[in-house]
Design a protein with these regions (language model features):
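Alpha-helical interface subdomain recognition
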Residues: 1-90, 99, 112-117, 124, ...
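N-terminal glycine-rich flavin-associated loop
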Residues: 94-116, 145
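Short glycine/proline-enriched turns and hinge-like loops at secondary-structure junctions
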Residues: 74, 144-147, 172-177, 194-199, ...
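A short core secondary-structure module
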Residues: 159, 163-215
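Long, acidic (Asp/Glu-rich), low-complexity accessory segments flanking structured domains
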Residues: 237-254
């Protein structure tokens, strides 16, 4: 494994950094003011997106693209440091058409959409003309086990009929959101025969303006109301043509992995960027502030916090780069890769809450205010412990993989023991 940036990676990172510092970062205060005034998206965002596309800084997060589609086809490893850069501003990714959940939805459509679906949905997403959302979690069941999902899909002749309720659907309140990808229980598709519940669900492409689709509310998270939305949505007798079914009936869980793996990696790298910024802000703060006749940076507990954060960020970055590298390898063990992606999800959430919490403590009361990005970083980090599945589900997946590996290695591990029986039976060399 070699994580050192390639020449291509360095070129694109430099271009992205120059654009970010010249055009995006100077608009940060204006973005917040616009959102506070109820104007979303801010009027300058379209100009920034057009400029980024003109400079080729577009769809940076997609390793594969259709012929003629705008983008760079950077590998996951090449995109990782760019994602870290963009993570410093939560809204920056949209400038480059790399924002969640659209990036994951585009990955899904790239793999499974037919020609009609690609023209209808994928092309405008790739061009940044529309936004989308992915509807999985539900309010009345434990969504951490996706086999519990109850939103139903039935067939009335050639018509697909959806009924149910989803919530915490990111992006659904965006004015440009046109597509809702819904995971639903297929009541009469081929998936109904599966006993363990993992081939009973299908994915359906639902236009946001379809009759029966109703956004009930935008749910605040820790008193933060995201302008793009984390919405509760009612699907009441939504009727669609057969072309709305994405991929095979009953294959929703397997298909969803196409978006969750890279998506979790992108979330993780953006977390690294936010943690780096939090640490830099905290270091600058304690160097300039004095208490009890000394700079705050001179206190040993503050130095411990800084050192712990530095070590944790570097450790997490190495894990994420390793996972990005493995995602790029065609021959990677899928079980190991699934465990790595789960580890990324857990580590990124833990890192962000711990590093940002220390930074807030070093800032003092100002760290709790909207005057710095720290309060938002902390609330987003806390949400990461639950989004895309709670930490405990991912830890369970990691443990199961480790236990399977241990079972396969049982015989070879016996030689490491020195029990009385083994001491009495030395091996023969000849």
């Amino acid at each position: 494994m070699d994580f050192s940036p390639s020449a291509t990676s360095r070129i694109w990172l430099q271009k992205a950094q120059t654009f970010f510092e010249r055009y995006v970062l100077p608009h940060n205060a204006a973005w917040h003011q616009s959102v506070a005034d109820g104007v979303y998206p801010p009027p300058f965002l379209a100009d920034l997106k057009a400029l980024a596309q003109d400079e080729g800084l577009w769809n940076l997060c997609l390793p594969t693209l259709p012929l003629g589609a705008p983008g760079t086809c950077l590998s996951n490893l090449q995109y990782a440091p760019i994602a870290e850069l963009l993570g410093r501003l939560p809204w920056a990714s949209e400038v480059f058409n790399c924002q969640a959940p659209d990036s994951g939805n585009m990955e899904l459509l790239l793999r499974y959409a037919d020609a009609w679906q690609s023209a209808r949905w994928l092309a405008p997403l790739l061009n940044g003309q529309i936004r989308s959302a992915f509807a999985m979690s539900e309010p009345d069941i434990a969504s951490s086990d996706p086999a519990n999902l109850q939103t139903s899909l039935r067939r009335d002749g050639d018509t697909l009929v959806l009924q149910g309720r989803k919530w915490f659907i990111t992006g659904a309140a965006h004015p440009d959101c046109r597509l809702l990808i819904v995971m639903c229980r297929d009541l009469d598709g081929v998936g109904q025969i599966d006993a363990d519940g993992h081939r009973q669900h299908s994915l359906v492409l639902v236009p946001m303006d379809a009759p029966g689709v109703q956004v009930l509310r935008n749910i605040p998270m820790l008193h933060h109301l995201a302008p793009e939305g984390h919405c509760e949505i009612l699907l009441h007798d939504v009727r669609l043509g057969p072309q709305a079914l994405l991929g095979q009936a009953g294959a929703a869980f397997a298909m969803a992995q196409a978006r969750l793996g890279p998506g979790r990696l992108h979330h993780g790298m953006r977390s690294i960027g936010q943690c780096e910024l939090a640490l830099r802000l905290a270091c600058a703060r304690v160097r300039e502030r004095q208490a009890f006749g000394h700079h705050v940076s001179a206190f040993s507990n503050v130095q411990d916090w800084i050192a712990q954060s530095r070590v944790a960020i570097d450790q997490a970055r190495l894990l994420l780069l390793q996972t990005a590298w493995r995602l790029d390898q065609a021959d990677s063990d899928p079980h190991q890769l699934r465990s790595d992606v789960a580890a990324v999800k857990v580590v990124a959430a833990q890192l962000q809450t711990q590093v940002v919490d220390r930074a807030i403590q070093m800032f003092g009361a100002m760290g709790l205010s909207p005057d710095t990005p720290l309060a938002y970083f902390w609330s987003w980090g806390r949400a990461m412990h639950l989004m895309d599945g709670p930490d405990e589900v991912h830890l369970r997946s990691i443990a199961r993989h480790s236990l399977r590996q241990s079972a396969d290695q049982g015989a070879s591990l016996a030689a490491y023991f020195t029990t009385p029986e083994q001491l009495q039976s030395p091996p023969r060399i000849r």
